[in-house]
Amino acid sequence: VRRVWADGRELDLTTLVVRVHRGDETQPPDPLIVAKEGADNAPAYRGLAYVVFERLPLESFGNRVPQFSFEVARPVDGLAAMIRAVCLIPGASEFGHETSPVMQAFGFGVTRPENRHQLTAAADVVASLDALQALCPNLRRVSLVVSWFGDDLRAGHCTVAPRVESAVKVTQGAEWSAAGLTRASARIVSQAGGAAAYGGTPSDASVVRLIRHLKDRGLEVVLYPFVMMDVAGDNAMPDPWTGAPGQPAYPWRGRITCDPAPGRVGTVDASAAAATQIEAFFGTAAAGDFAVASGAVSYSGPAEWSFRRHILHYAHLVQAAGGVDGFIIGSELVGLTRVRSAAGIYPAVAQLCTLAADLRAVLGPATKIAYAADWTEYGAHVRDGGAEVRFPLDPLWSHAAIDAVGIDFYPPIADWRDGADHADLAEARSPHDLDYLRARVAGGEAFDWYYASEADRQAQTRTPIADGAYAKPWVFRAKDLVGWWSSPHIERVGGLETATTAWSPRAKPIWLTEIGVPAVDKGANGPNVFPDPKSSESAIPPFSGGSRDDLIQSAPSKRSCPVSTPCWRAIRPAQTRSRLFTARR
């Protein structure tokens, strides 16, 4: 039971004593009825669900028992029972992580809730977690996303720092503070469409309280520090990828890179200048520059807002919260991890290795540490038409401080089109067909074949993925996690295999740190895209009409469809073919 109405008006359940008896065959009588009527006269109503209101103020209803209406929810077979881990977002919300109510005050007794927009719990995050655990009975872990903001796609110029929605906001219940900044001293997120482009960085105190709250619920906590790019559409900063003035609006963090970017004329890739730019992005903040006292983190290091300061701040903040089960040291920085300082040398990866070692010293041996690579980033870096093959992240994956290979896994699963003449009709009659989707988790695009151009995609002209030189096609298959995980990694130069990397086959589990399919028409064609009018990244899946499609994402009732949760039921068998996966759905 979630929401309750009395005479058509929703009740604030936080102001009432309400007990729900779920109707199982062993439920005892309600203690209030026993106290009033005696044990011999208080039925347990076993097999019948009922609700007891204790001391309901009947004067509010004309001194009579009102007519009640109840919202009742229960999990159904399929997706809900499969989910064992979730990412808790948004990571950009000043008080969205706060477990007690916070009000914005406007003067003269006028207030507005910052984090309570329902009547079932003290704060929205508490109500959401109540519903989540009720509907996902096997939930074990929560990946808690917390965001700072980057401001430039040029690595040598990009700062990473907390931001707020407004410099002038009076709040009751909690005040905003993060990394030693107050509302008055923090930078403000940019405006888009007359409103803040993002919510602000979560207040440090709210993160501490939410970590403790999650652990009190019996959930394991993985902290996921996240970089959002606050680059407004009217900026004049040079784009490292094109050289043109004005960087794309609100881009993906994976586009942060050296300037000029790899592939451009005059690029600094494969030079010492690239390493210098990477060093500027990571910064020099050290673990010893932070201290924890009274539940807060202080900093006494260099005056920089850098990636290292971002990650090390949260490493110390989780210590203030009593620790966490897992920690993500960064995610989807593919534009950085593919930059070279010389042939085969990747300075951002070396920086991540150093950071991982620093985090291990701060977090101790009990906390699992991982980097969450983009699904296009975790494996081989292929250059010169396949003549050069490197494995940039292998030093990180094999590092003693890293416990798992994290992958944000959003590859195309389907290639469905409208009409009666597209190629996939030979495999299935519907984009929701379970066998079709299951075959495409480790098959189809990015496994068996690829599109060499957009024109090829439109025409469905598919180029097979093969390795004529060494018969190791997994090297070029972004979706072949099993092949990558279970094989030695041998680099190639000039088309010839050279040295084996430090990776040991099957040495560490893979965490699917993010995974999902949007509830949109043909969502499985492009799980990695989403509409966002303010962002240059805004998109819908290829060949999608943009209409809603819940079936491709979540489970319908068995009555309406015997095959539930197409994408996730397909992914599950593919994972269990080997021991490489730690379940983090």
Predicted region positions:
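Aromatic-rich peripheral "rim/lid" segments of glycoside hydrolase catalytic domains that contact
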Residues: 522-585
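Structured segments of extracytoplasmic/periplasmic soluble domains
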Residues: 7, 89, 131-135, 145, ...
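Short amphipathic alpha-helices and their capping/turn segments at secondary-structure boundaries
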Residues: 74-79, 126-140, 207-217, 312-321, ...
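Short linear interaction motifs
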Residues: 1, 109-137, 190-207, 308-309, ...
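Well-ordered, non-membrane alpha-helical segments in soluble/globular domains
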Residues: 118-129, 200-208, 304-313, 346-357, ...
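Polar, S/T/G-rich
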Residues: 1-97, 111-114
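Substrate-binding cleft and catalytic face of glycoside hydrolase catalytic domains
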Residues: 84-106, 140-344, 368, 374-375
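Noncatalytic carbohydrate-binding groove/subsite architecture in carbohydrate-active enzymes
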Residues: 279, 283-531
